[in-house]
Curated annotation (Swiss-Prot):
Its main location: mitochondrion. This is ATPase synthesis protein 25, mitochondrial. It is found in: Mitochondrion inner membrane. It is a peripheral membrane protein. Residues 52-83, 284-313 are annotated as: Disordered. The keyword Kinase does not apply. Probable mitochondrial mRNA stabilization factor. It comes from Aspergillus flavus (strain ATCC 200026 / FGSC A1120 / IAM 13836 / NRRL 3357 / JCM 12722 / SRRC 167).
Length: 662
């Protein structure tokens, strides 16, 4: 009450009102401040200056009086609508920005794509959606083939993780797919990491230390959701003219790349894939021009290609008129073709021609064709020669093309072949020369020839490529600095480069054949390196291959990995690969060469009786008998005297059996 009295008191006095009159008279032309209608109806509202001035004698103009009278008129009642009941005005399509639109569907889209985009846009709330059709592009194996990629922007790190998690759950529940998200943190894991980060920030603020944990495992800013195959393509009938192998990728995949705004600008994934699409389009146009300008027919040399039985039965081989660039072609292989009917005859013809060397030492081109000689028969003839004779036939080096009759035959034959076949045949010749330890042929020259062949776009078969790797890993002949054979690190580096090239072009290099070559190359290195290769073989869990496993068994035994040897030995019958006489020959020969008395004794007493219990009983005869006798001498140097004196031990019994089978 006291405060109200103090406030009302001065306003009732005349000396307080008089100064206000002078102020009002000095500002007659000022418009009164409009007062809201709610305050006008309140009788206890604070009075304004204009209201006090209106109580004095009228000094204002007529217009001012009209305005005051109009303000005092009662306002018409209006209906008030709350904001939550007001209807939103529809927004035209022209006012919607590009970041608020669903991208257009590509040609021949899968049925799931339209609801997929609608869910990503409306329910997940991703912005700036971009759809890239990569179905005509060779994508990385991690993404798969026939990919439709969708790129979107999340509004925060939390929105990023929640959107990816909800998308995976939606695909599992609605379409029974099995998506996987790279970079996604689970709900509980994200909460735990955020809680720990907040705790570290509080501790840092209390101690006065700046908290800057950029790499916290949360703010990656990028999650890749691979929905997998969303639509299986129809199974087409097998093309009878198709030549090749491998699994054809069928079906369409959808991959969603979700970024934060900063990470999307940093990675710029759209530009990278658009550049790949542009390059593929240019290559397609270039190949179409090559096909259009190609000759209508292909001229083939009948002597350079072996026709299989299926081609010989038809009498006529139907060849495509398309350029060789797109056609499946038969190339030179390092291994002998299966069932080659004239292989032995061609080798015999080469041998007869070599025996009847002309006195001049030079050979005419017609003699090569009349003898029916091919590069395959020449290589088969060279493989059958001893190492010393083979080195003599290879001449003085890679530049020598006529010092021996073999080189004359070989290079005369190359002059009739195409540039691709001629280059591949030279690579094979280098492999054979280096494997026979010819001092004039270098591994650096082989590496250069191989890379020149691949850089020219020529097709080098996997068999020949693995031969190049095996040749690079062979031991070099002795020189001035090394008294014995050796394998320098530079050769191993070249072999690894060839394997990297094969891996980049899609060849499977993680197989028993390659690991056997690597294991054999590390036999001269430290035992730790060889054991590392053995651990890699165990870790990869490769499919069991009986032939390569037998080669690996011998390498493991020679590298003193006896446990690995016995594991593979016992695994043979369990993989439908029964032990043969050659396996037992290898077993007893390895123990005889090892010279360990205890191991030889244990091997004889255990596995000689097992020979008769095999699925196909193995008789003790021939080379096997000789290896068993050598192993008996290692186990007991006096075995012959002990058996003659009537000893009844297991070794004496085995010796007597060997003597009876001689």
């Amino acid at each position: 009450m006291m405060h109200r009295t103090l406030l009302r008191g001065p306003w009732c006095r005349q000396e307080v009102i008089l100064p206000l009159r002078t102020i009002t008279s000095a500002s007659k032309l000022r418009r009164p401040f409009p007062v809201p209608s709610s305050y006008k109806h309140n009788p206890r509202a604070f009075a304004s200056v204009s209201y006090l001035a209106s109580e004095q004698p009228s000094h204002s103009t007529s217009t001012e009086g009209k305005e005051i009278s109009s303000d005092n008129e009662p306002s018409k009642p209006t209906s008030h609508v709350p904001w939550y009941l007001q209807e939103d005005t529809p927004v035209s399509d022209s006012q919607i920005s590009s970041r608020d639109q669903i991208p257009d569907l590509p040609e021949d889209p899968p049925a799931i794509l339209s609801p997929f985009l609608d869910y990503v846009f409306r329910d997940l709330g991703l912005d700036e959606l971009k759809l890239i059709d990569l179905r005509g592009l060779e994508t990385p194996p991690a993404l798969g083939a026939n990919v439709i990629m969708i790129i979107g922007t999340a509004r925060s790190v939390k929105h990023l993780n929640v959107s990816a998690d909800r998308l995976c759950r939606w695909l599992r529940s609605n379409y029974k797919l099995s998506p996987y998200a790279d970079g996604l943190l689970g709900r509980n894991e994200l909460k735990i990491k955020l809680r720990r980060k907040a705790r570290r920030a509080r501790l840092a603020s209390r101690s006065g230390v700046m908290f800057d944990d950029k790499d916290d495992g949360i703010t990656t800013g990028w999650i890749c959701v691979n929905a997998g195959v969303v639509e299986e393509s129809p199974v087409l009938e097998k093309d009878e003219t198709f030549e090749g192998f491998g699994k054809v990728g069928r079906g369409t995949r959808i991959v969603v790349q979700i970024f934060t705004e900063e990470k999307r600008a940093e990675v710029d994934l759209e530009s990278l894939w658009q550049g790949a699409l542009d390059r593929a389009e240019r290559e397609k146009q270039k190949y179409s021009e090559v096909t259009r300008n190609a000759p209508p027919e292909e001229v083939r040399d009948s002597n350079s290609i072996y026709l299989p039985s299926s081609d010989r039965e038809s009498g006529k081989v139907h060849r495509s008129t398309v350029s060789l660039l797109f056609e499946q072609k038969r190339h030179f292989h390092s291994t002998r073709p299966t069932g080659h009917p004239n292989g032995r005859e061609n080798v015999d013809s080469v041998a007869r021609l070599m025996a009847s060397e002309p006195p001049s030492g030079r050979l005419a081109h017609g003699d090569v064709f009349s003898a029916g000689i091919s590069t395959y028969s020449l290589f088969q003839y060279l493989e059958g020669l001893p190492s010393e004779a083979a080195r003599h036939e290879l001449g003085t080096g890679p530049e020598d093309q006529g010092s021996t009759l073999f080189l004359q035959l070989f290079f005369n034959r190359l002059s009739t072949l195409s540039a691709e076949k001629s280059t591949v045949a030279r690579v094979k010749l280098l492999c054979m020369a280096i494997s026979r330890q010819h001092p004039a042929y270098s591994k650096e020259g082989l590496w250069t020839a191989f890379m020149r062949c691949t850089a020219s776009g020529y097709h080098v078969s996997d068999d020949l490529s693995f031969d190049v790797v095996s040749t690079l890993l062979t031991e070099s002949p002795p020189d001035d600095r090394n008294s014995g054979s050796f394998s320098p690190d530079s050769d191993r580096e070249l072999a690894v480069r060839v394997l990297e090239h094969l891996s980049l072009r899609g060849t499977n290099v993680l197989n028993m054949k390659v690991l056997n070559m690597l294991h054999r190359a590390t036999s001269t290195a430290s035992p730790e390196v060889a054991q590392r290769i053995s651990r890699i073989i165990k870790t990869l869990d490769l499919p069991f291959d009986a032939d390569h496993s037998r080669v690996l068994m011998a390498t493991l035994f020679q590298n003193q990995d006896y446990n690995g040897f016995w594991k593979l030995w016992r695994k043979l019958p369990l993989t439908n690969s029964p032990r043969t006489g050659a396996d037992y020959e290898m077993l007893f020969q390895l123990h005889a060469e090892l010279g360990d008395e205890l191991r030889a004794r244990d091997c004889l007493s255990t596995w000689v009786p097992m020979m008769a219990r095999e699925e196909t009983p193995i008789p003790l005869q021939g080379r096997l008998l000789q290896h068993v006798k050598q192993c008996l001498v290692v186990a007991d140097p006096d075995i012959e005297q002990s058996a003659a004196s009537g000893a009844t031990s297991d070794l004496a019994r085995i010796w007597n059996e060997c003597q009876r089978n001689i």
